[in-house]
Amino acid sequence: MVYLVHQNEWRSVWVKTLAKLNKNVLINISYHGTKFHGYAVQNDYETVQSKLQDALAWIYESKIYVNASGRTDKGVHAINQYISFYIDDRISLEKLREILNRYGQNKWYIKWIKEVDRNFHARFSAKAKTYLYLIDYCANNPLFYDHAWIVNFQLDFNLIEKAIPILEGTHNFWSFSTADKDKGLRTIHKIDLKQEDNKVYIYITGDGFLRSMVRMIVGALYNIGIKKYDLNHLKWLLDNPKKGRAITKAPASGLYLYEVYYE
């Protein structure tokens, strides 16, 4: 593993006796999804969680487990991910942010770190999340290949807008998930659709999401937009939940964790 921070600088923050980890902190972090093999720790692969925990272990000489607002799959980006963990007082929060950003080697950027209540948990304290999905018609520009779903033809925007109210509200979304068990009851508060130039922005806000749920919802809207199936079929998918029944899963490259909401 390559470190951008010189080892002597790391040693300057060490202490001979490990202090009690008594400070609960929250970070706001953005990252490029294609630089990691997802968020959660996986053997033999670099993930956001593993790299962050390695950095904290190096600084604090102790295993520190971090908790994110939610996991992101390989290739999925984060504009505003939130991660909480316990540390001690050996260095300031601003110094910690600076060191972690250098350790990230331009794969992530930590915007801020702040102390939070000891009972705060990045995942369990979250009330809602917004995901952004980006579709781009600019198929000849390779700069966008890792940042959007490249589509070679125009979608029927009016049909997609008509499909949105069907998906909003509380439903069993198991047909829009790759989860093995039927725990599909979720509430989508709002879906916003915006088209600018050659790009389509889909914002989906809900109280929680199943595995692959956002990507399969986008896949369903795509199928509506190309007239592969109609609005009645979309209703049928909700009324007859079964794992993966919606079939089409939009590419990870277009998905962004946009915001997480706390009280």
Swiss-Prot record:
The keyword tRNA processing applies. InterPro entries: PsdUridine_synth_cat_dom_sf (IPR020103), PsdUridine_synth_TruA (IPR001406), PsdUridine_synth_TruA_a/b_dom (IPR020097), PsdUridine_synth_TruA_C (IPR020095), TruA/RsuA/RluB/E/F_N (IPR020094). CDD domains: PseudoU_synth_EcTruA. It is an enzyme of class 5 (isomerase). It catalyses: uridine(38/39/40) in tRNA = pseudouridine(38/39/40) in tRNA. One of its GO terms (biological process) is tRNA pseudouridine synthesis. The active site is at 73 (nucleophile). The keyword Lipid biosynthesis does not apply. Belongs to the tRNA pseudouridine synthase TruA family. Formation of pseudouridine at positions 38, 39 and 40 in the anticodon stem and loop of transfer RNAs. Homodimer. This is tRNA pseudouridine synthase A. It comes from Mycoplasmoides gallisepticum (strain R(low / passage 15 / clone 2)).
